Amino acid sequence: MKAILRASRIGRVILRYRLDALLEGTPAERWLRLAKPFVPRASAEIAVQSRGARLRLALQELGPIFVKFGQILSTRRDLIPADVAEELTLLQDRVKPFDGEAARLIVERALGLPVSVAFASFDTVPLASASIAQVHAATLPPDANGVRREVVVKVLRPEIERQIDADIALLHSLATLVERTHPRADKIRPREVVAEIEGTLSAELDLQREGANASVLRRFWEGSDDLYVPEVIWSHTAERALTLERVYGIPSDDIAKLDAAGIDRKALAAKGVRVFYTQVFRDNFFHADAHAGNIWVDSDPERRLNPRFIALDFGIMGQLSQEDQYYLAENFMAIFHKDYRRMAELHVEAGWMPSNVRIDELEAAARSVCEPYFTRPLSEISLAQVLIKLFRVAQRYELTLQPQLILLQKTLLNIEGVGRQLDPKLDIWAVARPVLERILRERYSPRRVLRELSKRLPEIMTHAPDMPRLVHSWLKQQVEGRHQIDIRSTELLALDLSLRKLQTRVVTAITGSGLLVVAAVLYGLHPDGWYLGTVPVWSWISGGAGSAALLVAWLRR
């Protein structure tokens, strides 16, 4: 019954804000048409608003879960029009706070301690309130030196899980209906969108997980002059309550306060871009909700000329697969070099596009997207916009994107927005390019490869005894002709020649890999004998021969 009433309310809101065109061509359209006479007409003020603004207002009226839905939907620029996405980014996740005494009870249940024991003080008036949780100021009991440390406690809203479950169930039903009946369902992919929203909200409901995210990010940026991450107080953290060191700073979009504090905004903007690319390509762990409200600037007067960001809210973090990380970095470098052919090839090699796509068509599409940008002043070029438009054009060729890449698009857009607000003349290309080049150089250096091999030494040692037997078995199959093909035509002759070349490449690659394994084993065993630097000479010889074999295999593509 509650679901029916909730669906009825959603229908009324859709009609009042004139959003029924979104369901055009579906059975829901007929029901909405029948209900239209019984719903008050939109005011003249609403009627003149753009479709994006009307959708934003409707989501705000439907409540905090739908606000969160709109915020997540704003990241799906591959699915919704740009004007609607821009409007949805204005959604503010601010709601009326719940009772402070209720927050106190939730903290006590979560920690298994009375608040008066766990904390020296706990302010029942929240510092901030959002749809999932709210934040309270507190102090810890005195430490050995008698110091009472200031902290903030993030507390989940009461009954929030039940409310989210009910709204998500309703969204799943609506998504199924749209998928079955909407003429553009294959492009919109409604069930995929709802599943993504459900996953994001589920992650935000576990504050212990958020604490783990903060802890990992802090470890990556320990001692950095570019980014500070508050410490997690694990003794006072549980699934429904997260305690963090209290930090003080200036919101990154409060330009007046930044100027009053004497902050070097130009240096700060460049740091923001560098931090983002380092998180993505060095750490593979990036803050994926990096809007201005979650990025503060350290207000310490001593940091005016060397400013530092402070990260807040770690509910949504992003990670890429190693393949996506590599292909994305190569894509950016191809954009820098205006190598449209390479862009097209990378989209196919990454598995984002079907292998039967014509590379020359994709190359022409990439050129049509990028060339107009290259005619603009450098301060107006947006890598995020180029990437989004590339992916949007590629949709015509059945583009398949992982949710993490979509999350990265949104984060890059936010970071560029923050950077340009701090420094309108920020040349993102000039800042990003050397960072990418350095990270790629370090990532694929021989020293790093050897270090990674040594980390995997136990696994290599476990499987190494089986390798000769497996290689011998495979080669024996080739010699005995178990994969021979009876050639009957010139096309099959060409295929046979290709297979022979492939066979030679595979054998060369296996040999090269084996030699690299030997190099790693020798490096890990620290044998007696000559050393070059800290690496045994025989490791250099074996590793060099293995690298040469792999290079030969690669060149024979």
UniProtKB/Swiss-Prot annotation:
Residues covered by the Protein kinase domain: 121-509
UniProt xrefs under CDD domains: UbiB
Gene Ontology biological process: regulation of ubiquinone biosynthetic process; ubiquinone biosynthetic process
A Gene Ontology molecular function term of the record: protein kinase activity
Pathway info: Cofactor biosynthesis; ubiquinone biosynthesis [regulation]
Binding site for ATP: 127-135, 154
PANTHER family from the UniProt entry: CHAPERONE-ACTIVITY OF BC1 COMPLEX CABC1 -RELATED, PROTEIN ACTIVITY OF BC1 COMPLEX KINASE 7, CHLOROPLASTIC
Protein name: Probable protein kinase UbiB
Phylogenetic lineage: Bacteria, Pseudomonadati, Pseudomonadota, Gammaproteobacteria, Lysobacterales
